[in-house]
Amino acid sequence: MFNNSSKILFITIMIIGTLITVTSNSWLGAWMGLEINLLSFIPLLSDNNNLMSTEASLKYFLTQVLASTVLLFSSILLMLKNNMNNEINESFTSMIIMSALLLKSGAAPFHFWFPNMMEGLTWMNALMLMTWQKIAPLMLISYLNIKYLLLISVILSVIIGAIGGLNQTSLRKLMAFSSINHLGWMLSSLMISESIWLIYFFFYSFLSFVLTFMFNIFKLFHLNQLFSWFVNSKILKFTLFMNFLSLGGLPPFLGFLPKWLVIQQLTLCNQYFMLTLMMMSTLITLFFYLRICYSAFMMNYFENNWIMKMNMNSINYNMYMIMTFFSIFGLFLISLFYFMF
């Protein structure tokens, strides 16, 4: 639909919108940044040649407009309380703001729109939705001190993210439920420290990029494609599933490091109940990742072998292998660097 210059323009405006939200010192300014971000992201989603992407952009627009309306209304209520001394329950208003931000980020119990919308996106748009579009809402959530609502959202997110991915055959929905599960971990890290949240978000974004980069190159959208592709390239198949396990947080891969930090801090804060549920949910996600890996290595389907004529160029291959190296051995390298310096 757009040429590259248009995409660059919309991506730049989207980044500016997020920066306005993060640097704003008022809720009204934060709302304005979120709206700029929304209006620049929707043109990136829509595609005249793909009806599913157009439907996904409409779903995203309606959901985000609902959240933005609630956020604006709540911000006005807070301004009335602060400036006109009206008797407005501030904790109730903050709870409404928190709910609107959880809806914007796609956290449970406001996750209903997220997996269905992911199904209609290209991999690059899906990556932006799973990573960049979560920065502004999560930063605003960190300003609110409503622990009980955040605790409920964390528990529901990790459980729904784990159970929802069990019977999925679509890779995009699988990544969506994985994102909801990781969002629960990120929200729990927000309860402890903003720096731990930033570390977790960075590693999650990197691991998601490695997987979506591979899916985008080979146009992989369903599990049966994983079984039938890479029949002649065991190395690519092996590295792909190692990245899956790293994203799931299996030690000793890189994805275990942010979970390790969160587990350590939650233990120090005596949050044992929440931590137990989070770790159990992670075991469920690792179960379906391992099940996919086992099936893909044990079973080969040869119907679609003609599709393997599409070759991966050397630049993409080298880039993917470098990122995979850090994904698999990153924890060892960071530990070595820590002990040396």
Curated annotation (Swiss-Prot):
Belongs to the complex I subunit 2 family. The chain crosses the membrane at residues 8-28, 60-80, 95-115, 121-141, 146-166, 195-215, 238-258, 273-293, 321-341. It catalyses: a ubiquinone + NADH + 5 H(+)(in) = a ubiquinol + NAD(+) + 4 H(+)(out). InterPro entries: Complex_I_Subunit_2, NADH_DH_su2_C, NADH_UbQ_OxRdtase_chain2, ND/Mrp_TM. GO terms for molecular function: NADH dehydrogenase (ubiquinone) activity. Core subunit of the mitochondrial membrane respiratory chain NADH dehydrogenase (Complex I) that is believed to belong to the minimal assembly required for catalysis. Complex I functions in the transfer of electrons from NADH to the respiratory chain. The immediate electron acceptor for the enzyme is believed to be ubiquinone. GO terms for biological process: mitochondrial electron transport, NADH to ubiquinone. It comes from Drosophila melanogaster. This is NADH-ubiquinone oxidoreductase chain 2. Keywords: Electron transport, Membrane, Mitochondrion, Mitochondrion inner membrane, NAD, Respiratory chain, Translocase, Transmembrane, Transmembrane helix, Transport, Ubiquinone. One of its GO terms (cellular component) is mitochondrial inner membrane. It is an enzyme of class 7 (translocase). Changing H182Y: In strain: Japan. It is a multi-pass membrane protein.
